Swiss-Prot record:
GO terms for biological process: cell division; cell wall organization. Belongs to the WD repeat DSE1 family. This is Protein DSE1. SMART domains: WD40. Gene3D superfamilies: YVTN repeat-like/Quinoprotein amine dehydrogenase. Involved in cell wall metabolism and required for the separation of the mother and daughter cells. The lineage of its organism: Eukaryota, Fungi, Dikarya, Ascomycota, Saccharomycotina.
Length: 656
């Protein structure tokens, strides 16, 4: 029995034997001897009545439709301590580092902003802070900063938040720090008609123009706000530079160029370019009607960082379309999802799309699609939709003008909420990883998807060399990978739930074992959610200890619709990590559980208890008549070590 899932092989016997011109129609392959078939070409064309799993022609359709040829797909998962499973957004500071700092937000009222540090090389997650900032629906780190981020909530407020400095030294005597709100941006007060505000409106998107931390864009209630952060620092109540009312606005993405005025926007009207110098924007009714009829409305769009003229947009019909602003038309359709697309990410020319169906699709766009003047339809490499079988020619055929460039990664059993892509410090395309959060409050790190059919994983290495031993010793002594260390800096390091999808073909079983990562031990392969180590719970404090670190500069009218609880600014020292939390009535209310810093060792063992003479008689255990209490006591001391280490029966031990 294999140690991984292998689907049942269901097939139908050939109703008619494949036609071979050199044989009679009623001839049977089994009756033909090798002396009759002297031509090697005739032997190769001869086909058996029975299904032959070793024949590539018989298994070609099965392998592609069931994805049996795929391997080398690896995902690591961590559980985010959000009991309500209400995650909303994820943001990362730097995509070109091996230890990125990222944040995960929730729409809960307390303990809903988590700050983590990810070790891409060692596959470890370190929790630094848990902050209470109610109802976060969108956020963005300031460019080139790991201390400040902007968050948006459901009340129409955006906050510039100062995050405590990450303590990597493990010094417990460091100065106490806490998160604080540096500035508030009130969107709701700048809308003329309060009756037009939808009660479900949230600040769904925040971003900066061209990595410039002085220009902030945000979406609230079908309005695009443009803020100047430099003027906001000097103003008591920040005022936006412009407010553009755009009906059906869903998302935007600034151009990755030095042009600080053009922004790509999308919504019910489709996709469009927007000039910030002309804040008035109207959509013709005919365009809205046509987009609604053809389901061309879009909810996501991302510019290609390698080509300023190309962007990808996710439309309501579940198709990702590639657009070229020079042609004012789309030149490719990427079809691979069965539900609404929730996230798009570019990574070195390739595109990743996440959907509510729980799948992440990697679109291999390495070839220059723009050089091809013909319209291109792109589909999946595997699955039932990727198979086009010609029964007359008995072979697979590609659809006309279709390129199979999508590979599916089943990343979640619920839905994908947000994604980020990282490449590491060496910017290697082979080390490309995708980060995701889903509706089950899981954070996942997915390795790049390879087409492993043509990859040879065989190795003639049968023993460790001296260089291998030295390399393993260095990795064991590293503070970044040593899980069992008692240092305070490693107390919050969490190992992932590692899931490796192996090939289900027997020919690739050995290759899949060789592709398993060597830096994850059996102790890190956790079997359930309860075994995962989560972030430490916030400390319960009294009302007398509350202390606001910085007073918010604003008038009383800003607090009519939104009230902050003072505990959001409480400096709490928890070991070497500063956290902020509300006062809790009990541990169950916190929604965060804490476990030991290192994985539990699950070693099989048996427990035995030494029995005296009376216990033998009461329990009716067999023994010799000459066996007395004194002999038993002497024998007990002699056999004590073996009883504790060897799982044998009492009769074998005491009658020996």
């Amino acid at each position: 029995m294999t140690d991984y899932y292998e689907p049942t092989l269901l097939f139908r016997q050939n109703a008619l034997r494949r036609y071979c011109p050199s044989l009679s129609p009623i001839s049977s392959v089994e009756t033909l001897s090798s002396s009759i078939l002297t031509n090697e070409n005739i032997k190769g064309n001869v086909s058996s009545w029975m299904f032959n799993s070793a024949n590539p022609k018989d298994t070609e359709v099965l392998n592609q439709s069931c994805s049996l040829n795929r391997m080398n797909i690896k995902s690591n998962y961590w559980k985010i301590p959000d009991t309500n499973m209400n995650l909303t957004a994820m943001a990362i500071t730097d995509t070109h580092t091996d230890n990125p700092l990222f944040s995960v937000s929730s729409a809960n009222n307390e303990s809903n902003l988590f700050i983590y540090e990810l070790d891409l090389l060692g596959n470890y997650l370190t929790h630094h802070n848990t902050i209470s900032l109610p109802n976060i629906n969108g956020m963005k780190w300031l460019p080139n900063s790991n201390r400040h981020l902007v968050t948006g909530n459901s009340k129409g407020y955006a906050h510039l938040v100062s995050i405590p400095e990450v303590n990597r030294t493990g010094n417990e005597d460091s100065e106490e720090q806490s998160a604080e709100i540096c500035k508030r941006f009130n969107h709701r007060k700048h809308i003329k008609s309060k009756q037009d505000i939808n009660k479900h409106s949230t600040i769904s998107k925040l971003d900066f123009m061209n990595n410039d931390n002085s220009s902030l864009l945000s979406i609230y209630n079908n309005n695009l706000f443009y803020w100047d952060m430099n003027d906001a620092e000097a103003q008591r109540r920040p005022t936006p530079i412009s407010i553009s009312s755009i009906s059906g606005l869903a998302n935007f993405d600034p151009l990755p160029t030095h042009n600080a005025n053009l922004v790509g926007i999308c919504g019910k009207f489709g996709v469009s370019l927007f000039d910030l110098r002309q804040p008035k924007f109207t959509v013709p009714p005919s365009i809205l009607e046509y987009a609604s009829k053809k389901k061309l409305g879009a909810n996501q769009m991302r510019w290609n960082p390698n080509n300023e003229n190309v962007f990808a947009a996710a439309h309501r019909d579940g198709v990702v379309r590639l657009w070229d602003i020079r042609k004012q038309d789309n030149f490719a359709n990427l079809s691979g999802h069965t539900d609404k697309i929730s996230s798009l990410e570019w990574n070195d020319g390739d595109l990743f799309s996440g959907s509510r169906d729980g799948n992440i699709v990697h679109w291999d766009l390495t070839s220059d699609l723009s050089a091809n003047n013909q319209f291109m339809n792109c589909g999946l490499k595997e699955g039932l939709d990727s198979v086009h079988f010609n029964p007359h020619m008995n072979r697979l055929e590609r659809a006309i003008n279709e390129r199979q460039c999508g590979t599916v990664l089943p990343a979640s059993n619920t839905n994908i909420i947000s994604m980020c892509s990282v490449t590491g410090s060496d910017n290697s395309k082979d080390d490309m990883k995708v980060l995701s959060i889903d509706g089950s409050s899981f954070f996942g790190v997915h390795s790049k998807i390879f087409d492993a059919v043509n990859i040879s994983m065989t190795s003639d290495k049968l023993y460790y060399t001296e260089s291998d031993i030295q390399l393993m010793m260095k990795s064991e002594n590293s503070n970044n990978t040593l899980v069992g260390s008692t240092d305070s800096i490693n107390e919050q390091v969490t190992a992932p739930l590692a899931i490796t999808r192996k090939s289900t073909l027997k020919d690739f079983a050995q290759a899949a074992d060789a592709a398993r990562p060597s830096n994850l031990s059996k102790d890190t392969l956790l079997g359930s959610v309860e075994d995962l180590k989560l972030a430490p719970e916030p400390i319960v404090v009294d009302d007398d200890d509350l202390k606001i670190t910085k007073e918010i500069e604003d008038d009383l009218e800003d607090y009519n619709d939104f009230t902050f609880a003072p505990p959001s600014f409480i400096p709490i020292q928890n070991g070497n990590v500063s956290t902020c939390s509300h006062e809790l009535d009990s541990e169950e209310d916190s929604g965060i559980s804490s476990v030991e810093s290192s994985p539990l060792k699950r070693e099989a063992s048996f427990k035995f208890q030494l029995l005296d003479s009376l216990d033998f008689e009461e329990k009716k255990l067999p023994r010799d008549d000459s066996f007395n209490t004194e002999m038993f006591n002497d024998l007990r001391m002699a056999r004590q070590a073996s009883v504790r280490t060897i799982g044998t029966h009492y009769r074998n031990v005491y009658n020996g």
